[in-house]
């Protein structure tokens, strides 16, 4: 089943990287496709609230500052289709969440798709 037209939304990601490292590349941690500004904003807020108890005091303060003050800026920016970034540093690691406005293109529905009949001809090989 195909959707009939492109849909506006937000692509959300979470990355981590060592602070000050010139050799290590950022590590991708998670992504989320949000179909509203509120949904995108909520994804970051839930992640921050979830990890806040495990953060050091400076990182926890930064997280709560965004949740109380910075989140309002994010809520105003997203409907204007402006990208937003939230970053905190904890124990030598920078954790960054990004929210970018995107246009989701129509694709085949992810559920209910059947594999071609020939897919049953291939057997899993045990390497043990």
Across the structure, where does each feature detected by a protein language model lie?
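Short aromatic-glycine-(Arg/Gly/Cys) micro-motifs in beta-strand/loop hairpins
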Residues: 1-28
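Intrinsically disordered, low-complexity regions enriched in Ser/Pro/Gly/Gln/His and often acidic
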Residues: 4, 8, 35-36, 57-59, ...
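Ordered hydrophobic segments in well-structured contexts
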Residues: 9-15, 30-33, 85-87, 96-98
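Generic "edge-of-domain/loop-turn" microfeature
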Residues: 19-21, 39, 104
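Short acidic, gly/pro-rich beta-turn/loop elements at beta-sheet edges
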Residues: 22, 42, 107-109
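A short, exposed loop/beta-hairpin motif centered on an aromatic-Gly-Thr core
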Residues: 25-42
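Short, mixed-charge low-complexity intrinsically disordered segments
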Residues: 49-128
């Amino acid at each position: 089943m195909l959707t009939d037209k492109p849909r506006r939304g937000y692509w959300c990601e979470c990355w981590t990287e060592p602070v000050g490292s010139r050799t290590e590349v950022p590590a991708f941690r998670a992504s989320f496709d949000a179909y509203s500004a509120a949904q995108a904003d909520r994804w970051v807020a839930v992640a921050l609230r979830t990890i806040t108890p495990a953060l050091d005091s400076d990182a926890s303060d930064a997280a709560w500052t965004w949740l109380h003050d910075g989140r309002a800026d994010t809520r105003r920016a997203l409907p204007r289709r402006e990208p937003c970034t939230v970053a905190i540093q904890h124990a030598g690691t920078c954790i960054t969440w990004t929210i970018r406005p995107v246009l989701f293109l129509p694709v085949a529905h992810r559920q209910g798709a059947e594999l071609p009949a020939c897919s049953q001809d291939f057997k899993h090989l045990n390497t043990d």
